[in-house]
C-alpha cells in the first residue's frame, strides 16, 4: 500500500512508454537525450537539437539485464518511489529532458533489474507488468481495462460497467460461499448417505424473484445510456461521411463540398510498418487522419462500398456497422484534444486487421487552418 500510495502521487509515464509499441521504434526528444530499447537490447541517443524537433537516432552501448519488457517497466515503475532518482514522464519529455543515466545507469533500476531477472516471467507480469498497464492512460499491449474516456458516452459506458461489476462480484462471492459450504457440510465423512431433495417451493421462489430484481437494478441504469447513444444531434456543427472499402476508409466533409472543384474528401490507408515515422504506432497509424474540432457536436454518417465493415473508436465509445446500401449515423462530442485510434470491427476479408481509424481532435483554430489547407 505504501508503494501504491507513493506511486499514485508520482507518474506512470515511464511504465506506459516502456510498454508501448512505439517504444522500440522512435521518440521525439529534445537536447542530448537517450532511452533504452529493451526489445532490441540497445540504448539510443539523439544529437542536440532545438526542443520539439525530430532527431535522427543513433546507437550507443548501454546494456541491461535481460528481464523482459514487463520487468523493466516494473523496475522503472517502482523507481518513481525513490525521491533521489528523478524519473521522467516520457509523455512530457519535451518539457523535461531525459538523461541517459536516469534510464540505463540509474542505480535503483540496475539493482531492481538484477533481482527481477531471477523471478519467473509470469510472476513478473502478475506483480509488475499488469499493475503498470492497468494505470496507463493510452492503449497498451495486454491492456486489461478501458482506454480513457474522451466523450460523455464512453464515460457512461465505463460507469455502467462499474455498476454492473458491483453486482457481479456479490453474486460471485455468494455462489462461491454456497458451493464451499455445500462441499464442506455434506462431505462423505459427515453425510455418508446422500439426501434426496426433489422439490422446494421456497428456494424456487427465491431463485426466480432475486435474479429478476438483480436484472432490474442492472437494466434501469442502462436505459438513459442507451437513449443517449441513439440520440441524434438535430443541428451538428460538422458532418463527416465515412465509407468502408476493402481495405481502407474514405472520408467526406460534406459541409465544405460547394462544387466539384472544391471538396474535402480523402482516402485513409494504414501506414506500412517500414514507412512508420517518429512516434507512429504499428498497425494503427494512417496516412490521412480524420481531423475534427474538440468540444463540438459531430455527426458521422457511415456506409460501405463493398462488404460489411464497422467504424469503431474505443476512446470515443462509438461502434457503428458500415452496411452497403444503408446509411447509419452516430453523434459524438469529443471533450478534449488528442489522437484517438480505432479499427474496423467487422470481419471483412483478408486484410480486415489492416483498416485502422485515427481521429485527431484539435482546437477550433487549428481545425480551421487544416480545412483551409486541405481545400486549397
Swiss-Prot record:
One Pfam family from the record: COX2
GO MF, one example: cytochrome-c oxidase activity
Keyword Cell inner membrane attached: no
Gene3D superfamilies: 1.10.287.90, Cupredoxins - blue copper proteins
Subcellular location: Mitochondrion inner membrane
Residues at which Mg(2+) binds: 346
Membrane protein topology class: Multi-pass membrane protein
Residues annotated to bind Cu cation A2: 344, 346, 348, 352
Topological domain ranges for the Mitochondrial matrix compartment: 185-204
Uppermost EC category: translocase
GO cellular component: mitochondrial inner membrane
Protein name (record): Cytochrome c oxidase subunit 2, mitochondrial
Native species: Vigna unguiculata (Cowpea)
Taxon lineage: Eukaryota, Viridiplantae, Streptophyta, Embryophyta, Tracheophyta
Amino acid at each position: 500500500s505504501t508503494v501504491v500510495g507513493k506511486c499514485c502521487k508520482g507518474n506512470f509515464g515511464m511504465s506506459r512508454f516502456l510498454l508501448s509499441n512505439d517504444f522500440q521504434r522512435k521518440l521525439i526528444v529534445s537536447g542530448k537525450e537517450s532511452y533504452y530499447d529493451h526489445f532490441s537490447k540497445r540504448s539510443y541517443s539523439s544529437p542536440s537539437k532545438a526542443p520539439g524537433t525530430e532527431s535522427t537516432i543513433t546507437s550507443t552501448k548501454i546494456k541491461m539485464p535481460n528481464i523482459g519488457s514487463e520487468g523493466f517497466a516494473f523496475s522503472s515503475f517502482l523507481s518513481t518511489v525513490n525521491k533521489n532518482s528523478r524519473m521522467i514522464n516520457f509523455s512530457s519529455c519535451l518539457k523535461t529532458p531525459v538523461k541517459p543515466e536516469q534510464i540505463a545507469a540509474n542505480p535503483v533500476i540496475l539493482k531492481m533489474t538484477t533481482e527481477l531477472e531471477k523471478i519467473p516471467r509470469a510472476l513478473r507480469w502478475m506483480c509488475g507488468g499488469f499493475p503498470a498497464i492497468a494505470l496507463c492512460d493510452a492503449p497498451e499491449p495486454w491492456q486489461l481495462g478501458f482506454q480513457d474516456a474522451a466523450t460523455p458516452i464512453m464515460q457512461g459506458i465505463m460507469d455502467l460497467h462499474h455498476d454492473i461489476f458491483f453486482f457481479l462480484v456479490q453474486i460471485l462471492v455468494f455462489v462461491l460461499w454456497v458451493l464451499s459450504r455445500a462441499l464442506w457440510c455434506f462431505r462423505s465423512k459427515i453425510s455418508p448417505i446422500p439426501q434426496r431433495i426433489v422439490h422446494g417451493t421456497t428456494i424456487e421462489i427465491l431463485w426466480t424473484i432475486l435474479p429478476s430484481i438483480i436484472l432490474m437494478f442492472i437494466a434501469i441504469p442502462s436505459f438513459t445510456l442507451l437513449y443517449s447513444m441513439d440520440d441524434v444531434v438535430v443541428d451538428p456543427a460538422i458532418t463527416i461521411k465515412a465509407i468502408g472499402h476493402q481495405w481502407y476508409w474514405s472520408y467526406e466533409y460534406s459541409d465544405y463540398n460547394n462544387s466539384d472543384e472544391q471538396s474535402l474528401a480523402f482516402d485513409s490507408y494504414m501506414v506500412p510498418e517500414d514507412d512508420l515515422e517518429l512516434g507512429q504506432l504499428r498497425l494503427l497509424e494512417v496516412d490521412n487522419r480524420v481531423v475534427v474540432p474538440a468540444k463540438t457536436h459531430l455527426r458521422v454518417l457511415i456506409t460501405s462500398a463493398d462488404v460489411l465493415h464497422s467504424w469503431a473508436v474505443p476512446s470515443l465509445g462509438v461502434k457503428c456497422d458500415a452496411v452497403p446500401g444503408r446509411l447509419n449515423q452516430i453523434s459524438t462530442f469529443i471533450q478534449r484534444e488528442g489522437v484517438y485510434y480505432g479499427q474496423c470491427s467487422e470481419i471483412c476479408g483478408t486484410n480486415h486487421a489492416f483498416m485502422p481509424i485515427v481521429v485527431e481532435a484539435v482546437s477550433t483554430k487549428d481545425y480551421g487552418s487544416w480545412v483551409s489547407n486541405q481545400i486549397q
